[in-house]
Swiss-Prot record:
PROSITE patterns: ATPASE_GAMMA. The keyword Transcription does not apply. GO terms for biological process: proton motive force-driven plasma membrane ATP synthesis. Produces ATP from ADP in the presence of a proton gradient across the membrane. The gamma chain is believed to be important in regulating ATPase activity and the flow of protons through the CF(0) complex. This is ATP synthase gamma chain. It comes from the Bacteria. Keywords: ATP synthesis, Cell inner membrane, Cell membrane, CF(1), Hydrogen ion transport, Ion transport, Membrane, Transport. Pfam families: ATP-synt. Belongs to the ATPase gamma chain family. GO terms for cellular component: plasma membrane; proton-transporting ATP synthase complex. It is found in: Cell inner membrane. It comes from Acidithiobacillus ferridurans.
Amino acid sequence: MANAKEIRGQIKSVKNTRKITRAMEMVAASKMRRAQERMRAARPCAEKIREVLGHLAQAHPEYEHPLMQVRPVKKAGFLVVTTDRGLCGGLNVNVLRNVVQKMRELHEEGVESNLAVVGNKGLGFLRRHGAHLVADVNGLGDSPHLGDMIGPIRAMADAYAKGEVDVVYLVSSRFVNTMLQRATVEQLLPVEKPTASAEQRAELWDYIYEPEARPVLDRLMQRYVESVVYQAVIEHLACEQSARMVAMKSASDNAKRMVDDLQLAYNKARQAAITQEIAEISAGAARFDDCAQHFWKF
């Protein structure tokens, strides 16, 4: 058993660590609330773009945008969203596990994969494992802007439009609640064609376009893909802060339990030391009495 001095040093160290994890927990909670507000603010824009795009596609079925063309899959693209920093539980692990699993399934079918990565954690992992990276971006911070992440988006969209990849998957985390974040693999390209019933088509109305509808559809399709990825990045940021808050709370709770255990061990060590000192004093006193009695005999 360690002596009382060593245990006292361990208690001090764990208490200092707990102060740090508590501070990180509170910071993550504050950032999580702001990230959730950004996520909710971005959602109506993406939904409105999707609504207008669906209306345009149904009103002009004769025009098939290159990003909506379905082809036999010979090569796949992945746009992977991860974090720049760690200490967020298994958030990145779950995302990257999904990427590896999907790539393995495609490889068994003879399909190769290209990857574009958002976030330093995913970039480092995929580089170490020899993945074919075509674009990456990191250092987006806590308030990412669409312009900062446009590189990977354009790389995947252009590759699909040119026929260099035949399908693009978006891999990220979806925010369910503060305690639960779910890693997902969703098809980003080709964009699914909207469907309408006969009654809906009969009631379909149209906008007036100047000079024509095709440039509007082209531009809107590009904005739609960008909005989907931006929404995924914002949502992943909310997941990151939630996971970090939960991880730091767990670390703080574990530190408290460790301090309690160390305090108990310290009390036992101190009690043992005091008991030993009392025993030594008693033994010394008894020895002194024996010597004194022996002395007075003479």
